[in-house]
Amino acid sequence: MTSPLTPSASEGRWTPRLWGTLLVLCAAMFLDALDVSMVGVALPSIGADLGLSTSSLQWVVSGYILGYGGLLLLGGRAADLLGRRQVFLVALGVFALASLLGGLVDSGPLLIASRFIKGLSAAFTAPAGLSIITTTFPQGPLRNRALSIYTTCAATGFSMGLVLSGLLTEASWRLTMLLPAPIALVALIAGLKLLPRSARERDHNGYDIPGAVLGTASMLLLVFTVVQAPEAGWTSARTLLSFLAIAVLLTVFVMVERRSPGPLIRLGVLRSGTQIRAQLGAMTFFGSYVGFQFLVTLYMQSLLGWSALHTALAFLPAGALVALSSTSVGSIVDRFGTQRLLAAGFALMVVGYALFLGIDLDPAYAAAILPSMLLIGAACALVFPSLNIQATDGVDDREQGMVSGLLNTSVQVGGAIFLAVVTAVVTAGAPADPTPQAVLDSYRPGLIVVTGIAVAGLLIALSGLRRTTGAQQTVVVARSDTRSVVKETATGTEAETERVPVRD
């Protein structure tokens, strides 16, 4: 299902141009993750230099999350309608300019604005980049390998961001903001030459402006509410009214999408059990990991007294394992299918989190911490590529951006919601007498929640494993004059359908 405007990969082999295309897209994914992790370590220096309060400092992080999570649905559909290459390159250019702005500003509000713009840009590069891969590389071993390399760049970027931030902040926090700019510029120049040209969707049924406004508004409000809830209070009038407004917006959004001839999100996509499992798996995978990283970072820095760089190096084995496995995961998917890898990955994740429950105040890294890091790294290497493959397999080229945006939205919303839940649990159990042991004990309920989220992901994966029982599935894409309907079948037939075999 490749576009006639994409470079030919029908022979099932890698070419220098395909490698160049993938490298550009990986650079953008790497930058997104790098930017998220680098700023966390630099926050104390930023606050001291710009005179920001703790609440204002939070928005240096939350501003990026708000722009990214709130606009992913729009970014994915824009890639389908306006051209994937065009959307990706314009957004990458904006990302580079916002990085430059963030490193040069001398006020908190401008820094927060630059972070929001970077998040907004990433909301367009992420789904556009993923959809370029799924429409350039033919479905099967070639695409699976490309996706496994692409998705592991996120873990690599995140791990390197932690280490680089610890080093750069020693000189100036501004370097952490400026570093992505030259990388983005080089990727932009290379992308102009290497990325395949894609035509705009000519036969779409107009632009879904009401759906875009409602979908973006509901996602922005959801992310904002979840980020603010721990400070405002989960049962406060403001939080409850915000959730009520979100429910109303989403209800109206669904009504609009059902009637729109060219919807922002075609709701029929969500009738596929495989698609539902991919979206829920993305939420539980990222939500559990973000909560784990938050608690472990607090443990290492607040209770063990480790520096930011020491903490980053403690997480490095997990990222290194993901990076080293990047070229082999695709072939494992070809052999065993995504559902088996998801079940195995979530099982490893559950064990890794559970092992950390027994941690104490005097741990031996090799015996107490490293095993969890390696198990979680192996889990990430299996789960994240499999989720991307599962979500995009069998989807029409015209809807790859939409599905990519939906998957990335699930990742971000899951991370925001579950991190807020873990934070609320830990805050509720904060000890009156904050001795180190009492504080450590207050972290354990949060770790139990993290483990429970991973167990939920494992159950979702196992439900798909029972359905497939090792057989090959067929995703049926049925078309009508105005919209498509995607659904899952094992033996049924459909009139006017296109069948795509998927190893689920």
What are these regions (language model features)?
Residues 2-193, 327-329, 336, 347-350, ...:
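Transmembrane-helix bundle of Major Facilitator Superfamily
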Residues 1-17, 464-504:
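Intrinsic disorder in cytosolic terminal tails and internal cytosolic loops
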Residues 132, 136, 194, 224, ...:
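A residue-level signal for alpha-helical anchor/packing sites in multi-pass solute transporters
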Residues 76, 105-107, 138, 169, ...:
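Short helix-capping/hinge motifs at transmembrane helix termini and TM-loop junctions
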Residues 18-34, 39-41, 54, 175, ...:
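12-transmembrane solute porter fold
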Residues 163, 186-193, 221-224, 252-255, ...:
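Transmembrane alpha-helix boundary/anchor motif
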Residues 152, 156-171, 224, 413-432:
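A gly/Pro-rich, aromatic-decorated transmembrane alpha-helix motif that marks the paired
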Residues 148, 169-282, 288, 306, ...:
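Hydrophobic transmembrane-helix bundles of small-molecule transporters
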